[in-house]
Amino acid sequence: MRTSQYLLSTQKETPADAEVISHQLMLRAGMIRKLASGLYTWLPTGVRVLKKVENIVREEMNNAGAIEVSMPVVQPADLWQESGRWEQYGPELLRFVDRGERPFVLGPTHEEVITDLIRGEINSYKQLPLNFFQIQTKFRDELRPRFGVMRAREFLMKDAYSFHTTQESLQETYDAMYTAYSKIFSRMDLNFRAVLADTGSIGGSASHEFQVLAESGEDDIVFSTGSDYAANIEFAEALAPTEPRAPATEELRIVDTPNAKTIAELVEQFKLPIEKTVKTLLVHAHEESGHKLVALLVRGDHDLNEIKAEKLPQVAKPLTFASEEEIRAAIGAGPGSLGPVNLSLPVIADRSVAVMSDFGAGANIDGKHYFGINWERDLALPLVADLRNVVEGDISPDGKGTLQIKRGIEVGHIFQLGTKYSEAMKATVQGEDGRNQVMTMGCYGIGVSRVVAAAIEQNHDDRGIIWPDAIAPFQVAILPMNMHKSFRVKELAEELYTTLRSHGIDVILDDRKERPGVMFADMELIGVPHNIVIGDRNLDSEEVEYKNRRVGEKQMIKTSEIVEFLLSQIKR
């Protein structure tokens, strides 16, 4: 590719509305342009990277035995009603009607469509297992699209779906997809971790996320110092404290706290250790519990894990916090004065709260708190459950080592769905015994466009992007100095350009009439890994300058050896 025949579209200034570095650099490098909130046009440089990611994903899916299909973005609403997700999915599902008043959705995912397809095509256990994949546009009507293509409304995704008659068969394909995903992200030279995860709205029994480690990540990823345990913080179990509850040393007393409506204010004003305080959070109760609200207790320095809380049978799904109006109607006090003593609601305490003694909490009277609270003296010990997020230093759930926490960007997710969709949609095959059997399913997703942004978050400096070779828009940039004035510079540049292309190398020849500084800045910004500078002075000694974008080192290479040298440097 020649820059004179290419839309480079680089920008010097950082757009004011771009929050994260990947969004800033994708705009400045001319990879994307915003069309509307959460909607982006991909420009040539962006498309080149996107296609590189797609090709790696497609190759490894094929290597793993998956079969490519293509399903419509527009899906009939009746499939979503049949699966039960029409009501469950919420406002992220964009719903519309056609001219015949028939309801449809823009697909955020394709479980319903593939299940509908396979139930009409597969009728015998002898045809299974099968694994189908596509690389397709998805749409989720995000409330607040942000971070560029990281959390866009329209995005490109690889989704795969497998069908089985046994759990053992599903496990084999799940393991094969786990291996394929590891190969995909390794080929892209990404620093990633596969972590245990919650199944979320997709459903199912087992799940792993593939997280690219980056400070800008939205997810907290938990690692053990003593084993290979790794999990999303939403999934990681907080073990019960091993130390028994200390005996009571204080009397229960009620204290006026008119200006302490938060844990932080209580700790500041009364010099109470934060680990001696309890937060009382009221959420809507499950309708079968016979109550409107249920109280959840976590230690003052801990955060409620809403995923864990929502799984409790006493809690309504989706988890919804009580409004101040609902709290006052039920308790007679505001949210800043709630506590477990004399509380006329069902109470569930976190494991760490259950071993506390001499602690403080609201008195269920505005402007008052109880101090010196002790279980089984001042109130009965309630139901106990794991309700909190783990923190650094906690014992690992597998009992080996302690936990560390890092930030991650989710780029892939694999699920063992079981029979959630196939049972709801009556997707059956004839089993070995001649009886109809519901198929067992797995699903496996990769955010293709998100991978591009995640790679930038891991690979950049103050001059621009530093692409890994495998997904760079161009592997080599040829930068001829004053080629329009020097015949021998132009001759070598053209010869090198032709030779590298014949070896299958993606190369860009900067043949613009631009100053060297502009040429260097643009190639650094778009992240070309290998750069060759051809100048008249160096040609006197039959040399060119090679610069590696990642390490920044410059080398003088003989013109007769440059092709062989580049082929040895490029990871292919």
Swiss-Prot record:
Which Gene3D superfamilies has this protein been placed in?
Anticodon-binding domain, Bira Bifunctional Protein, Domain 2, YbaK/aminoacyl-tRNA synthetase-associated domain
Decide whether keyword Transmembrane is in the record: no
**CDD domains named among the record's database cross-references:** ProRS-INS, ProRS_anticodon_short, ProRS_core_prok
Where does it live in the cell?
Cytoplasm
Question: Mostly located where?
Answer: cytoplasm
InterPro entries from the xrefs? aa-tRNA-synt_IIb, aa-tRNA-synth_II, aa-tRNA-synth_II/BPL/LPL, Anticodon-bd, Anticodon-bd_dom_sf, Pro-tRNA-ligase_IIa, Pro-tRNA-synth_IIa_bac-type, Pro-tRNA-Synthase_IIa_type1
As recorded in UniProt, its EC number(s) are: 6.1.1.15
Determine if Ligase is one of this entry's keywords: yes
- NCBIfam families for the chain: PRK09194.1 (NF006625), proS_fam_II (TIGR00409)
- Domain note for this entry? Consists of three domains: the N-terminal catalytic domain, the editing domain and the C-terminal anticodon-binding domain.
UniProt record similarity statement: Belongs to the class-II aminoacyl-tRNA synthetase family. ProS type 1 subfamily.
Q: What is this protein called?
A: Proline--tRNA ligase
UniProt source species = Yersinia pseudotuberculosis serotype IB (strain PB1/+)
Ranked from the top, the taxonomy reads:
Bacteria, Pseudomonadati, Pseudomonadota, Gammaproteobacteria, Enterobacterales
Gene from which the chain derives: proS
